Amino acid sequence: MSNKYLVEGSTSELTTKTAAELAGLIHSREVTSREVTQAHLDRINEVDGEIHAFLHVGEEAALAAADAVDKALDAGEAPASALAGVPLALKDALVTTDAPTTAASKILEGYMSPYDATVTRKLREAGIPILGKTNMDEFAMGSSTENSAYGATRNPWDLERTPGGSGGGSSAALASGEAPLAIGTDTGGSIRQPAALTNTVGVKPTYGTVSRYGLIACASSLDQVGPTARTVLDTALLHEVIAGHDMFDATSVDKPVAPVVAAAREGANGDLKGVRVGVVNQFDREGYQDGVLEAFHASVEQMRSQGAEIVEVDCPHFDDALGAYYLILPCEVSSNLARFDGMRYGLRSGDDGTRSADEVMALTRAEGFGPEVKRRIILGTYALSVGYYDAYYLQAQRVRTLIAQDFTRAFEQVDVLVSPTTPSTAFKLGDKITDPLEMYNFDLCTLPLNLAGLSGMSLPSGLASDTGLPTGLQIMAPAFQDDRLYRVGAAFEAGRK
């Protein structure tokens, strides 16, 4: 199977180039940022009716930003960043002053933020035109982008299948040539999992290294904003733009940004000599799709052939990660989403003068939230209630500590860990949406990193032999050493060419 949208289906070669290539053309004035941005806007108009990657397209604002870059470059000014002039798709969980921010929920339909998220501001300052806001599972709760109040996104590799979630819109935009760069958020795999299903690259940075200010929260101790693109280098270039300490984010860490771009360039030589790669036993076993395991084993052997030392690693508490995650996350959701009550912003239902404030709040939340969001609010409220807090929430937090300790011990033995990103390739739309447990199981490989606050990357690892659909290799690194992801990821990417 091939992705007809990215290669054969493109009407402009500008939409098939990497972000680094586009930046080189723009900065050398061989092409303008307006031409590149317009090509991608045309591409969105051409194919997004089928893909539905975008919830909002800001053509006027994107072209104005592109014109500003062109004007500065024509005046002899240095580019504002390595990606100045290259357009980008932004997940609709990050607030913007010039476009609606809905988090794909009816309760925020039409909401206009009075301020930009820190990541949004950094993108603007870097001269990166924002093409629009991408579709997602409502409030980032889901693994297929089917939970969006505005319709599902489709996978460019097979329109009957999911692009993953919660950030399927961003990855589908990349895979269909609608954008060369995108921003996602990752609570339990929402960047990495869609990247695996769409043959793109996605990174969850170390918790606290990219600002969450202006991110509509799902679970505050798990959420992390991150970059996604079609190559490791492009992802590194975007990572460097958005990372850094932010005084407006209480969870932001005041540490130097890891040298991710330098690491990606270093790894491009394909040499993995001296790198110890740990294969996590808990993620290499029966129950995963045969084609996914075959691709994973082939990836491990490729890394061995590139000089890496392969070490089997045991992380016993990973088996309990799914249960712990789906207790901690709903508890944080029930707290975070209490603010959406119809009183201050967003939807307000039944406010006809005959109902009390409590009745208006109840009706607003009943009409404004979708089924999965309601399910998690109820679960979280129950787990936090008197008599159950110690038995459920505190126990889950203890398991979280044990998982972090497993990672610490593992990284004493190896430089990075690897696993499949997902247990299977993309499933058909509708297959899991009525079975929450099946949907939750799709996050098995990715969510332990979020519980521990560490960094991870998914990058293409070949097509599955049984479905012909993309698979992803997940690389995991210690906290604040995100550059290891890029060094190893770029080398692996080079070895596949």
Curated annotation (Swiss-Prot):
Its EC number is 6.3.5.7. It is an enzyme of class 6 (ligase). It comes from the Bacteria. The keyword Nucleotide-binding applies. One of its GO terms (molecular function) is glutaminyl-tRNA synthase (glutamine-hydrolyzing) activity. The keyword Ubl conjugation does not apply. The active site is at residues 91, 166, 190. It catalyses: L-glutamyl-tRNA(Gln) + L-glutamine + ATP + H2O = L-glutaminyl-tRNA(Gln) + L-glutamate + ADP + phosphate + H(+). One of its GO terms (biological process) is translation. One of its GO terms (cellular component) is glutamyl-tRNA(Gln) amidotransferase complex. Keywords: ATP-binding, Ligase, Nucleotide-binding, Protein biosynthesis. Residues 150-173 are annotated as: Disordered. Allows the formation of correctly charged Gln-tRNA(Gln) through the transamidation of misacylated Glu-tRNA(Gln) in organisms which lack glutaminyl-tRNA synthetase. The reaction takes place in the presence of glutamine and ATP through an activated gamma-phospho-Glu-tRNA(Gln). Belongs to the amidase family. GatA subfamily. Heterotrimer of A, B and C subunits. NCBIfam families: gatA. This is Glutamyl-tRNA(Gln) amidotransferase subunit A. It comes from Corynebacterium efficiens (strain DSM 44549 / YS-314 / AJ 12310 / JCM 11189 / NBRC 100395). The lineage of its organism: Bacteria, Bacillati, Actinomycetota, Actinomycetes, Mycobacteriales.
